[in-house]
Amino acid sequence: MPGRADPSGGRAAVPVPLPVAVAAAPSPASVRSALPERSARPGGAGLRAKGFAITDLLGLEAELQPPPGAAPGPAGGYEGGGALGLGLGLLCGLAGPGAPCLLPAPLPLLPARGPRPGPPGPPPAARRHKESASDEDSLSGDASELKMPASQIKRKKRRHRTVFTAHQLEELEKAFNEAHYPDVYAREMLAVKTELPEDRIQVWFQNRRAKWRKREKCWGRSSVMAEYGLYGAMVRHSIPLPESIINSAKSGLVGSCAPWLLGMHKKSMEVSRKAESQEKPADGWQAEQDGEELQGKQASSQRSSEKLGPAKDPEDTAIDLSRTAKQEKRSVLRQCVNGDPTTEQKDRDH
């Protein structure tokens, strides 16, 4: 490529792509001739024709134009690289002729100066939303941490358990051996004996039956469990014991089809009989009191009748006498009118 003669009379060397040592540095006049051309461009718009100056030949002023429609990048980039190359050229020119200088390859291959552009970040609105969401998460986390102790306290609050004494357990076990399903009357009697509420006694029996069933299942007595379930249903729904089971127990409980059920039925019947026998003395004493009251009423009525008797008798007799006298008068008149011989004979006798 032919070079242009500069004022100093030297020729410029052809540029190579790799850094090379330049034997003769350009004079300051050539560098100054390039500067007005660079500053004459209005705002850097449009491309001018390349000259034959050392800066043009070495590509020191080569600037990459951004593609149309592309957003302008951050300040720096290749324009900064061009300015850097220009500064290097000036330094080489001032160093004087004959001083070797290493110049870089075409500057478009140089990396951009300044901070490397990272991946495109989210827009400011999205960033604000993200920050607000993180704040809300942190607030909710703090609130949940504050709420956790309350929930743990609520979970720790358990129902008050009834602590049974030895005497209460003894009475309850006795009642359980007599009947696994006590009725309301039996539970009330137990409540009086043990000084426990009736509902707590009912819950104790439920737990005791569950424990008994678990133990029987471990022993593998399935027939007893079936009888137990039947007995519970009978007690709940007031169903009488089937006659077939009662008839099968005539020879004894051992030969019956449901010995355990019959045993429990027998125990419950004994308990009910005991309760009836305890109620009978009270009923007899009340009957005696009622009889005594009736006798007293009868005696008082007799006394009142005796007091009124003498006053009534003369009146009754007077009424009767008046009636008989009237009847006699009527009969005498009739006899006189009729001329009855009997009346005449009576008059003669008189």
Swiss-Prot record:
Pfam families: Homeodomain. Restricted to bipolar cells of the retina and spinal cord. One of its GO terms (cellular component) is nucleus. GO terms for biological process: neuron development; regulation of DNA-templated transcription; visual perception. The lineage of its organism: Eukaryota, Metazoa, Chordata, Craniata, Vertebrata. Its main location: nucleus. Residues 157-216 bind DNA. Residues 217-270 form the CVC domain. This is Visual system homeobox 1. It comes from Gallus gallus. Keywords: Developmental protein, DNA-binding, Homeobox, Nucleus, Sensory transduction, Transcription, Transcription regulation, Vision. Residues 27-47, 112-159, 271-350 are annotated as: Disordered. The keyword DNA-binding applies. Binds to the 37-bp core of the locus control region (LCR) of the red/green visual pigment gene cluster. May regulate the activity of the LCR and the cone opsin genes at earlier stages of development. Dispensable in early retinal development. It comes from the Eukaryota. It is found in: Nucleus. Residues 112-125 have a biased composition (Pro residues). Belongs to the paired homeobox family.
